[in-house]
């Protein structure tokens, strides 16, 4: 019977200790603006706005960390999601992809936005501004299809 209070106290101390060790997220060092999506790729303002609202937090080096990202468990979950997102697509390093990879990524952006896979439902639940409307998705797909075609035809 006396084990439960001791176990609970140990868990509380562990939580407090891990909170103290949790570091605030810092901007990415060495981020080069000349490699970002809009550095050499013409992106209409409404499309860029949609990308910033729905994609950039996980798919760029310009992550806006929410307040709850400083909480111990949430910090690790969110950091894992952002790391995975940047690994799949990093809009801050857009020019580092070859033109065919960029065209493929543009196709995936349209497909995932159209099917509701991106942004993920848990992100949309916490970030209402990330919910893309049907016209937003159509504009995003129209642009991505045009840009992908341009890249495949020899654009850079």
Regions found by a protein language model. Give the residues of each.
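Acidic helix-start/capping segments at beta-turn-to-alpha-helix junctions
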Residues: 65-80
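C-terminal capping alpha-helices of c-type cytochrome domains
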Residues: 115-117, 122-155
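Aromatic-capped interface at the extracytoplasmic side
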Residues: 19-32
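Extracytoplasmic electron-transfer domains, predominantly the class I c-type cytochrome c fold
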Residues: 76-126
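Positively charged n-region of N-terminal signal peptides that target proteins for export
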Residues: 1-4
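Electrostatic cytochrome c docking/interface patches
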Residues: 29-51
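The canonical Cys-X-X-Cys-His
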Residues: 51-63, 118, 140
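Hydrophobic membrane-insertion alpha-helices, especially the h-region
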Residues: 6-22
């Amino acid at each position: 019977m006396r084990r439960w209070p001791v176990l609970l106290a140990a868990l509380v101390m562990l939580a407090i200790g891990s909170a103290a060790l949790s570091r605030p997220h810092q901007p990415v060092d060495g981020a080069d603006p000349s490699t970002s999506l809009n550095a050499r790729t013409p992106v209409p303002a409404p499309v860029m706005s949609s990308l910033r609202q729905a994609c950039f937090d996980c798919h760029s080096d310009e992550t806006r960390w929410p307040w709850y990202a400083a909480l111990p468990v949430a910090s690790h979950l969110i950091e894992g999601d952002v790391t995975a997102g940047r690994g799949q697509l990093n809009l801050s390093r857009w020019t580092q992809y070859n033109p065919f990879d960029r065209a493929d990524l543009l196709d995936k952006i349209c497909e995932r936005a159209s099917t509701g896979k991106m942004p993920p439902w848990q992100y949309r639940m916490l970030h209402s501004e990330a919910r893309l409307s049907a016209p937003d998705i159509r504009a995003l797909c129209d642009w991505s299809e045009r840009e992908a075609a341009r890249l495949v035809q020899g654009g850079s």
